[in-house]
Amino acid sequence: MEHYLSLFVKSIFIENMALSFFLGMCTFLAVSKKVSTAFGLGIAVIVVLGIAVPANQIVYENILKDGALVEGVDLTFLNFITFIGVIAALVQILEMILDKFFPALYSALGIFLPLITVNCAIFGAVSFMVQREYNFAESVVYGIGAGTGWMLAIVALAGITEKMKYSDVPAGLKGLGITFISAGLMALGFMSFSGIKL
């Protein structure tokens, strides 16, 4: 149990997808204007990562890994296309669920919901799972933890961006400029976790 807890904390703070690896920056910067929208997208990312990482772990271990199907047959060259296909299918299912049961959130997320399919944070988490050879339980914990870390980062940036509306930001830095500076300062804060070994 301690191993899974340390993996969860490590994936949130020490190896934060957005602020340590700088993955998923397109949606991270574009949807971080309102806390409510950022929170909704963060929940969607947690759900997708919490399902996509273990689903791809099952596919990798039982189909793609060297000798999984037939002795001597290595299908790892199909990793990228297979992982993207699984992620795309999961995002389509999530999109249909949000459209049916949460139409306000669905319309608020707009084009960024289908973009989760090609969000490099999702694919990065799946790639890290393969590289680090996580088992099924570890992949579930890692997927949920990585999604939680990404959500924590985007909600924090959205909160800062909302507060910046009431600040006297220089004209040359308004908009994306101050967002980059804020994200950079947040990343510096998260660097303080990098020396922690769990």
From Swiss-Prot:
It is an enzyme of class 7 (translocase). The keyword Transport applies. It is a multi-pass membrane protein. One of its GO terms (molecular function) is oxidoreductase activity, acting on NAD(P)H, quinone or similar compound as acceptor. InterPro entries: NqrDE/RnfAE, NqrDE/RnfAE_oxidrdctase, NqrE. Signal peptide: none annotated. The keyword NAD applies. Keywords: Cell inner membrane, Cell membrane, Ion transport, Membrane, NAD, Sodium, Sodium transport, Translocase, Transmembrane, Transmembrane helix, Transport, Ubiquinone. GO terms for biological process: respiratory electron transport chain; sodium ion transport. Its EC number is 7.2.1.1. The chain crosses the membrane at residues 11-31, 35-55, 77-97, 110-130, 140-160, 176-196. It comes from the Bacteria. Its main location: membrane. It is found in: Cell inner membrane. GO terms for cellular component: Gram-negative-bacterium-type cell wall; plasma membrane. It catalyses: a ubiquinone + n Na(+)(in) + NADH + H(+) = a ubiquinol + n Na(+)(out) + NAD(+). Belongs to the NqrDE/RnfAE family. Composed of six subunits; NqrA, NqrB, NqrC, NqrD, NqrE and NqrF. NQR complex catalyzes the reduction of ubiquinone-1 to ubiquinol by two successive reactions, coupled with the transport of Na(+) ions from the cytoplasm to the periplasm. NqrA to NqrE are probably involved in the second step, the conversion of ubisemiquinone to ubiquinol. This is Na(+)-translocating NADH-quinone reductase subunit E. It comes from Glaesserella parasuis serovar 5 (strain SH0165) (Haemophilus parasuis).
